[in-house]
Amino acid sequence: IESYHMYDSMVEVKRYFTKFGGHKLAAGLSMDRENLEPLRKALNEKAKLTEEDFIPKVHIDVPMPMEYANYNLAKELERLEPYGVGNPKPLFAQKDISFVEAKRIGANGNYAKFTVEMMPGGYPRKTDLMYFGDVDAFCTFLDEKYGAGSADHLFAGDKSYLLSITYQIGINSFRGRESLQYIMRNYC
């Protein structure tokens, strides 16, 4: 939770710890077991979180049509690595992209590979868009947005749907070949 400062909160209840340390986003501690419930109660009482604090926030670096994100840009972005909390991987956004087909991938079918259609220069071009999130939740969202059975139609490839997304780009290396890879992070 972005608005919750872990270390500052721990300082307020330090009497429950034998030792502790950390920063805004992470903390470590040692404590006696009998202090667990009093600690939980004290932290909950002192927390100044609102319902809005629990809503995940998405920070978009640049709204950018997918056709502008190319292999050369992905190679340039590699130079900014390593990515982490202080240096997040750039996140792009595009409104109203056409999802034309989908298939489950991965050993358990828990990921998805979508075929999306872009319109660079007014000419349609299809490309792959990977999704490593909760595919079942995506299907539920699609059915709620466009009606029951919509996800089945998309996976059958017989109906397309417009969605707005955030995405990242990277280089996929497979069998000695490199290619641009689009990865969806969020959708609405």
What residue ranges belong to the model's regions?
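Acidic, two-metal ion nucleic-acid-processing modules in DNA metabolism proteins
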Residues: I1-C188
